[in-house]
């Protein structure tokens, strides 16, 4: 009779963590930075169909690095959770802290108890407040750990190199133009040869507290970004402005402008992947954590 093969729990967790880190390291970096009027998200992303940065709710936004199909499922689950909580209680009860904790519970459970592979994702959830002191940001790792964002946070494979550059150039309560230029410069120096990133290689959005609409999320269009960075845009005229994000869509984000009222919650298909079931195991039917 052969002896059963044994692997210690410590070795299993170590192998799963190494697997997840390798997957995340292949993703392009995203920076989440606080500035004087809110929070800006800057990521290297040449695709116009697949977003790394999205709106979750009125004052909440989401950024991710890693495997796209996995963090897109998490985004959809977050939108559904926020919509349900805002509908059952009040829109003001939808907070970044609650959403970050929900993501942490789901990712932690899937990492430690899941029979399949761990999720190769790293997330950031940010909430803009009425004043700069009220702004909040949270980083959620593949194993469910949550840390506060202080000033700025970089996600993705080149996070260490980009963070090192940003540490030397970041200014607290700086203007958007200053923060954007520092972020783009840092993303271009990600440990390889220094690169100059063009506006069409970037995805940029802000949570801006000065907006009169309930929804504070705003995408920065390519031409507006070119003006902020002081470079020439590739197309369109001076009249093209920034675009809004229809984050309630299950797929890519639809642009819309001039929206003054928050949109009605939209349904999410039932087959969005196992992660939706994992989140539902943590949340009750009314969108609140179940009692243990």
From Swiss-Prot:
Pathway: Protein degradation; proteasomal Pup-dependent pathway. Residues 282-292 have a biased composition (Acidic residues). SUPFAM superfamilies: N-terminal nucleophile aminohydrolases (Ntn hydrolases). It comes from the Bacteria. InterPro entries: Ntn_hydrolases_N, Proteasome_alpha-type, Proteasome_asu_bac, Proteasome_sua/b. The 20S proteasome core is composed of 14 alpha and 14 beta subunits that assemble into four stacked heptameric rings, resulting in a barrel-shaped structure. The two inner rings, each composed of seven catalytic beta subunits, are sandwiched by two outer rings, each composed of seven alpha subunits. The catalytic chamber with the active sites is on the inside of the barrel. Has a gated structure, the ends of the cylinder being occluded by the N-termini of the alpha-subunits. Is capped by the proteasome-associated ATPase, ARC. This is Proteasome subunit alpha. It comes from Catenulispora acidiphila (strain DSM 44928 / JCM 14897 / NBRC 102108 / NRRL B-24433 / ID139908).
């Amino acid at each position: 009779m052969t002896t059963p093969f044994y692997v210690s729990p410590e070795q299993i967790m170590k192998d799963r963590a190494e697997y997840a880190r390798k997957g995340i390291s292949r993703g392009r970096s995203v920076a989440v930075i606080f500035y004087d009027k809110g929070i800006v998200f800057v990521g290297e992303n040449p695709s116009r169909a697949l977003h790394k940065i999205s709106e979750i709710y009125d004052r909440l936004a989401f950024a991710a690095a890693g495997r796209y199909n996995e963090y897109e499922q998490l985004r959809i689950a977050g939108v559904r959770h926020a919509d349900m909580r805002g509908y059952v209680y009040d829109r003001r009860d939808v907070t970044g802290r609650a959403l970050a904790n929900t993501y942490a519970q789901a990712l932690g459970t899937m990492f430690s108890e899941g029979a399949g592979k761990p999720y190769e994702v790293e997330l950031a959830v940010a909430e803009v407040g009425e004043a700069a002191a009220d702004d909040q940001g949270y980083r959620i790792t593949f194993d469910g750990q949550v840390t506060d964002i202080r000033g700025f946070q970089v996600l993705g494979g080149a996070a260490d190199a980009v963070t090192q550059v940003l540490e030397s150039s970041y200014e607290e309560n700086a203007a958007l133009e200053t923060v954007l230029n520092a972020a783009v410069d840092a993303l271009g120096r990600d440990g390889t040869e220094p690169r100059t990133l063009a506006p069409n290689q970037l995805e940029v959005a802000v949570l801006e507290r000065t907006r009169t609409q309930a929804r504070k999320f705003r995408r920065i269009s390519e031409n507006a970004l070119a003006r902020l960075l002081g470079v020439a845009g590739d197309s369109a005229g001076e009249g093209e402005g920034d675009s809004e994000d229809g984050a309630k869509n299950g797929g890519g984000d639809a642009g819309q402008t001039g929206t003054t009222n928050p949109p009605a919650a939209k349904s999410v298909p039932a087959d969005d992947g196992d992660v939706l079931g994992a989140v539902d195991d943590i949340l009750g039917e009314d969108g609140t954590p179940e009692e243990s």
